[in-house]
């Protein structure tokens, strides 16, 4: 639907002063949502949410991606804090960081 300039102005104007979110809040939200900005990372998070923990090899078996690609996605999730890992000899066990997930949910709720 094409609007006239007058209609567009009427639609987009408000008498209320909008408050911008705190910079730290916005940066936190951007960082955590960026970690979920790829479908493979969303699938990894979903997989880890449904399991208590998961070895890297088990994650690779569930994903239609090369092991190196899965490792890169896990690295991003770990760097943003959504995922934690524990090294057990030659194996790496991954799990969801429940505090970070709760923080993400709280940030989204504040939108």
Protein language model features and the residues they cover:
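A cross-family signal for key residues in well-ordered alpha-helices
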Residues: 46, 78, 105
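Short, structured secondary-structure boundary patches
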Residues: 65, 90-92, 106-110
């Amino acid at each position: 639907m094409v609007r006239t300039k007058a209609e567009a102005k009427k639609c987009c104007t408000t008498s209320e002063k909008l408050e911008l979110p705190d910079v730290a809040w916005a940066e936190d939200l951007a960082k955590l949502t960026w970690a979920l900005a790829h479908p493979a990372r969303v699938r990894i998070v979903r997989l880890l949410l449904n399991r208590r923990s998961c070895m890297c090899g088990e994650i690779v078996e569930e994903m239609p991606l090369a092991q190196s690609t899965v490792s890169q996605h896990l690295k991003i999730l770990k760097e943003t804090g959504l995922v934690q890992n524990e090294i057990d000899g030659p194996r790496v066990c991954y799990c969801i960081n429940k505090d970070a997930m709760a923080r993400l949910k709280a940030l989204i709720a504040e939108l």
